[in-house]
């Protein structure tokens, strides 16, 4: 099962947090993960993300032309995602390495339409 994880970001001030979030997604134990990065209306951030992640096959980068907010950016990420399942993570969060594996297990073991859980520090 392919899982697309949508990660939205918008400012260089938070870029180091964004990088940690992105790297935690890319380090998942599940082997079919697509990271979908949506940059919300910042050319500087878009250029940096494309430079740092644009050549990766497991990363899809989308840059909004203008700042549309988190909800619209997440919706855009879900629209461009190619996975069977779409998950969301904030740009200041770090995913446990087995997060996607547990998500996939929930979908494969039960007849569910959605799954969620708590985030811990």
Residue ranges and their predicted role:
Residues 1-24:
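N-proximal low-complexity "stem/linker" segments adjacent to membrane-targeting elements
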Residues 22-63:
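Acidic donor-binding segment of Leloir-type glycosyltransferases
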Residues 7, 37-38, 116-118:
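Short beta-strand segments
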Residues 86:
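Short aromatic/hydrophobic "clamp" motif used to bind/position activated sugar donors
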